[in-house]
């Protein structure tokens, strides 16, 4: 789970996933499928998880600033899908801090069924 000041809109092109978004005064997992649209306001805690065995492809509408972040931390789609290395995780943490993103703790994530390994900057 994380938050940042930039709003994000997601239009699902392929695959199925769940998105944790603010709903009813709390957070709730919402299932989304191709053709679905999700709006995440700026500073809202949110998360995504792929609940299928297929890749999920989104069209993301956001700020140019967030686009720069994705460019800096992303990996080419042509690269084989592998877990990030410790170096890649460290770079992601560093860039997240530079952009002012808040990454939720392992305990906060666990409360919503997300298990993240402990790591630090």
Feature roles, as predicted:
Residues 1, 5-6, 16, 20-121:
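Jelly-roll (double-stranded beta-helix
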Residues 10:
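Structured binding elements
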């Amino acid at each position: 789970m994380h938050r940042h000041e930039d709003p994000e809109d997601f239009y699902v092109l392929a695959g199925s996933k769940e998105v944790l978004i603010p709903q009813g005064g709390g957070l709730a997992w919402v299932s989304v499928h191709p053709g679905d649209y999700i709006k995440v306001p700026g500073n809202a805690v949110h998360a995504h998880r792929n609940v299928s065995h297929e890749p999920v492809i989104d069209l993301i509408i956001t700020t140019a600033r967030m686009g720069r972040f994705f460019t800096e931390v992303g990996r080419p789609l042509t690269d084989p899908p592998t877990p990030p290395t410790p170096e890649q995780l460290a770079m992601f943490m560093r860039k997240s801090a530079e952009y002012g993103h808040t990454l939720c703790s392992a305990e906060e994530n666990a409360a919503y069924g997300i298990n993240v390994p402990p790591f630090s900057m």
